[in-house]
Design a protein with these regions (language model features):
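Residue-level signal for inorganic ion chemistry
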Residues: 40, 96, 115, 157, ...
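A residue-level structural signature of the nucleotidyltransferase/glycosyltransferase Rossmann-like core
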Residues: 57, 109, 175, 201-202, ...
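Short beta-strand segments
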Residues: 9-11, 59, 110-113, 142-146, ...
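Left-handed beta-helix
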Residues: 1-3, 206-363
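General beta-strand structural signal in soluble alpha/beta enzymes
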Residues: 58, 82, 111, 142-145, ...
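Conserved N-terminal catalytic core of the sugar/cofactor nucleotidyltransferase
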Residues: 1-9, 17-27, 32-113, 117-125, ...
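Conserved core of the sugar-phosphate nucleotidyltransferase
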Residues: 121-243, 264, 341
Length: 363
């Protein structure tokens, strides 16, 4: 039933908002910040029972292939698809489609990420089974997250008319995708019960999404066709190198989903999802101690400290806090970050500043 169902894990990002732990040599998906395994390993682990390793594809950049394959050698190395340059998630989808249509013309793919936290693996597999069934109706499918609070850091999806029940789950036509809202708007959307968070996980038949790319992004489609024509011969890498830089960067949401002819959303019931988009979002996903503090690593000493996230580098660096609250303290060995949790999103500004200053050793 699922022999034509493939998981495509996007694993090429760097996660600049988790600096100073996330760096060029150790991107976000290779961090051990939620247990003993990396985020990438957890992303593969949770697919067990639905996708054999032979049907798990990984899209990443060339200098991360060896690292990721080393973390999960059971995935065949030929299943790693190399993205020559960052050109947005729409082009990643297109490249994965090219690879899969040569392997299995009847393929259905689940677009997943390597750097999210999901606590309820069984529910994810239920959602994916339901999405696979819906996708056979030649529609595009996205997974929605039932909001637990009025988040301003996520996009929202407005549910429309019911589409049907699949695998015991309700599905809905999508009325519209909405940008990350201001807090007042987020409160209204959460209260009305008609909106879910956009998880960034998508399921569709390869031919269906390629049809949407051809209709909405004809320039990208033409370039993908050139790449496809060379995919199985010795000119593949040269063609990729020549064509890929000419692709205009675009996201899945803007490039494909917002104007697609029909999109169906499946709201999660209790997925335990977090996109780990910042130190603050990681803090929100982990239970703290009696004082609300979370220690990811190390053995700090805390006096009169509340609501603080601490990650030490080693036993040689002792972190001591006195009379503070709502801080993020990260020691990576060569850099220390101290910031108010409310300003966690601004860590990306630090990375941009370091780039402008040419301080490559800290990137």
């Amino acid at each position: 039933m699922y022999e034509n169902f493939y998981a495509v894990i996007m694993a090429g990002g760097s996660g600049t908002r988790l600096w100073p732990l996330s760096r060029k040599h150790q991107p976000k998906q290779s961090l051990r910040i939620a247990g003993d395994r990396t985020l990438f390993q957890y992303a593969v682990d949770r697919l067990e029972g639905l996708f054999p390793h032979e049907r798990i594809m990984v899209v990443t950049v060339a200098d991360q292939v060896d690292m990721l394959h080393g973390e999960y050698p059971e995935i065949p190395v030929e299943n790693f698809i190399i993205e020559p340059l960052p050109r947005g998630t729409a082009s990643v989808v297109g490249l994965a489609c090219v690879a899969l249509k040569h392997r299995d013309p009847n393929a259905t793919m689940a677009i997943l990420t390597a750097d999210h936290l999901i606590r309820n693996d069984a529910h994810l597999r239920q959602l994916l089974r339901a999405a696979h069934a819906v996708a056979q109706e030649d529609v595009l499918v996205t997974l929605g997250i039932t909001p637990s609070y009025p988040a301003t850091g996520y996009g929202y999806i407005q549910k429309g008319e019911p589409f049907g029940d699949y695998e015991g789950l309700e599905t809905f036509d999508v009325n519209r995708f909405k940008e990350k809202p201001r807090e007042a708007q987020a409160q209204v959307m959460v209260a009305d019960g008609q909106h879910v968070w956009n998880s960034g996980m998508f399921i569709w038949r390869v031919d269906a999404v390629m049809g949407e790319i051809e209709r909405q992004m004809p320039d990208l489609y033409d370039k993908l066709e050139k790449i496809s024509d060379a995919w199985l011969d010795e000119t593949k890498m040269d063609t990729l190198a020549n064509v890929w830089p000419m692709i205009d960067p675009q996201t899945i949401d803007y490039g494909i989903m917002e104007q697609a002819q029909q999109v169906v959303v499946i709201p999660s019931v209790d997925l335990g999802w977090n996109d780990v988009g910042s130190w603050e979002s990681l803090f929100e996903s982990i239970d703290g101690d009696a004082a609300g503090n979370i220690v990811l690593r190390g053995d700090p000493i805390t006096f009169d400290t509340q609501g603080t996230l601490i990650c030490g580098d080693s036993s040689e660096h002792l972190i001591v806090t006195i009379g503070v609250e709502d801080l993020i303290i990260i020691d990576s060995g060569d850099a220390i970050l101290v910031c108010d949790r409310k300003h966690a999103q601004r860590v990306r500004d630090v990375v941009n500043y370091l780039k402008k200053q040419g301080r490559e050793d800290y990137l």
